[in-house]
Amino acid sequence: VKQGVYYGWKDRDFQKQENQIGTIKLEHDLTDNLTLSNTAVYNKSKNDYLWTNPDDSKGNIYKNGNVWARVNSRVADTDTFTDQLALTGKFNTGRLKHSFNLGAEYSDQETDRTQYIINGDNTTGNKYQNCTPADSISSGWCTSVQNPNRGPWTGSISTEGADRYNIENENTSIYFLDSIEFSPQWILDLGLRWDDYSAKQTMTYGARNSAVLGNSTTPPTAKAGDKVAIKNDSDFINYQVGLVYKPVENGSIYASYATSSNPVGVDGGDGSEGITAAIQNLKPEEVKTYEIGTKWDVLNEKLNLTAAIFRTEKTNTRATTDEGTTQNIGETRVDGIELGVNGNITDKWAVSAGYTYLDSELVDGGYEEITPSTTPKTYRPNSNNGNQVQNVAKNSATLWTTYQVMPQLTFGAGAIAMDKVYANAANTKYVPGYVRYDAMARYNVNKNVD
């Protein structure tokens, strides 16, 4: 396919975004070693788009040389309020020096979203995804993969009749961090956090929903305006511990262990699945990370070198059981290495580079239904167990460097490289690796113009 080929309509497809942020921060020094602060942030955003995504999930390119012009669209209005109250300070217990942060956070996010109906039909055009019969071509839902035939857009787009969603996410948390210095060479970092999280999604049926329309064999099961609400409430505790050893002033070696949680519905406001009836009562997914690393400042502390090895284990992931239900039984694992360089090699030459290696594995994907189906349905351990985790590249690297030729003139160049990533758990579909090159030149005319 030639570079620059576009399968949508340039006079139809669009994206509009708005973002308004207001921040108020108050800070008061209670003593020389004790500070109380409060930061409140209000964010109002809008994301309104409709674009075309060429989709060949049905193999049309090989069947008839066409591609399905699937539509992605969203109209989302999001209001977010966050408030953080923190008490930071220093104190000593005998010979131990403490630097602590005690705080509480509250956040509330509400999103109202819908999507566009195309030609009064549906939101994506999925009934044309096989690019047959011929009306899928004439109506514009399919087009030639090599020479897309796109005249002016003559159809209609409207949110009338589309389903509407209201997503509310609320979180209250309390945390405590303490960095304890035993000596200039040894430092212990401790952290504890409690979260109370709730997610609620209310879906209002639109007139174009298939459950409202029914078909020749299935009568309608809902009416336009009907509402379905699902909710998940969970609370969880996470913690971290890290030990730092500084053999010299400009170098350190550390080991750390940390946990985190991914509750149901945490991504609902992003337009993804978020929360569904099948998972609304499940527990949060749990993540454990083990890491050993080192950091060094060299060349008179102008250049920072870092290296780390780590393991991340994600348990309690949502997977299908041998009874066909969804439960917290899955597990994935990633072993990795990170190397980094950042800073100045000389006064005029700066560099930022990094390399990451990730060995990922689907340890337990639950169960899958045996195909062809049996009656009653029977399940077997997931055949994808042992595969590379989708959307995780084994190798990735970045490089950016600049050189100041003269006080006013600087040149820069760099590259970003990414290994192939699999698009499905079966590791049968993938996006190939790539390298992207960048370059720049900057000239400072004066302190106000460059």
Residue spans of the language-model regions?
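Residues on the lipid-exposed face of transmembrane beta-strands in outer-membrane beta-barrel proteins
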Residues: 22-28, 83-89, 174-180, 241-245, ...
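Transmembrane beta-barrel architecture of outer-membrane proteins
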Residues: 17-21, 78-86, 169-175, 187, ...
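Conserved C-terminal beta-signal and adjacent last beta-strands/turns
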Residues: 76, 88, 100, 290, ...
